[in-house]
Amino acid sequence: MKKALLALFMVVSIAALAACGAGNDNQSKDNAKDGDLWASIKKKGVLTVGTEGTYEPFTYHDKDTDKLTGYDVEVITEVAKRLGLKVDFKETQWDSMFAGLNSKRFDVVANQVGKTDREDKYDFSDKYTTSRAVVVTKKDNNDIKSEADVKGKTSAQSLTSNYNKLATNAGAKVEGVEGMAQALQMIQQGRVDMTYNDKLAVLNYLKTSGNKNVKIAFETGEPQSTYFTFRKGSGEVVDQVNKALKEMKEDGTLSKISKKWFGEDVSK
């Protein structure tokens, strides 16, 4: 009986070790693939970029030409150009963006991504935008004037965004949406009280849309920077993108693009 048990134990142990070895082999293969990512990108001559295409003025379609444009689109296109690459944009809803990156549908995300709570999972470029969060309400809403008024109110947010965390931390009840456009629509319909979003995006919306039905109730939080975002292990690709960004900062190109879209340099 003891011999039978010992034999069974040895079989199980060997199987477990084999499984661990296979897991390590698979992990090594995955790391090798990511390590070869830059070589693969160079060979294809194409940088594949995930972006929303619905987040004006960062990534959206021009109303007249339907061409994908925006600050993020222009910056990453210039980065690729300096690296001798073309850009292939893959438009994706925000809440599916990181799943697309993880599944290697694209090499990088260009969509105003913050680092908070993501640094353990992803690699990031140097920053290329700095802004603050604002809270938007209906024009005639006089109940929300500061962070202290948010608790118990309903805020429309993309569930995987940092703005969702700001709303939740302030005590708001969150209604999930696909982006800022839907959030603003729900505010005007009276279905939610507010939304947290980027100051630059909201100012641009108010300027270009002429919408008088919503307003910025207040600014909140510390200045937030945004970064191009990569899978972990994309080291050489990140280095190359940072090299191009550094050149763009030094020769004034990044500042020029920033002033074109916002009237000031928001890249610092």
Curated annotation (Swiss-Prot):
Gene Ontology biological process: amino acid transport
Look up the domain of life of the source.
Bacteria
Keyword check for Isomerase, yes or no.
no
Leader sequence range is 1-19
Which Gene3D superfamilies does UniProt cross-reference here?
Periplasmic binding protein-like II (3.40.190.10)
| Topology in the lipid bilayer | Lipid-anchor
Matching SUPFAM superfamilies, A to Z? Periplasmic binding protein-like II (SSF53850)
Q: Where in the cell is it found?
A: Cell membrane
What's in the keyword line of the UniProt record? Amino-acid transport, Cell membrane, Lipoprotein, Membrane, Palmitate, Signal, Transport
Q: Does Lipid metabolism count among this protein's keywords? A: no
- State the GO CC annotations: plasma membrane
Task: List residues with covalent lipid attachment of type N-palmitoyl cysteine.
Answer: C20
Q: Quote the residue positions with lipidation, kind S-diacylglycerol cysteine.
A: C20
Protein task: Part of the ABC transporter complex TcyABC involved in L-cystine import.
UniProt subunit comment: The complex is composed of two ATP-binding proteins (TcyC), two transmembrane proteins (TcyB) and a solute-binding protein (TcyA).
PANTHER family linked: ABC TRANSPORTER EXTRACELLULAR-BINDING PROTEIN YCKB-RELATED (PTHR35936:SF34), MEMBRANE-BOUND LYTIC MUREIN TRANSGLYCOSYLASE F (PTHR35936)
Q: So what family is this one in?
A: Belongs to the bacterial solute-binding protein 3 family.
| Protein's recorded name | L-cystine-binding protein TcyA
This protein's gene is called tcyA
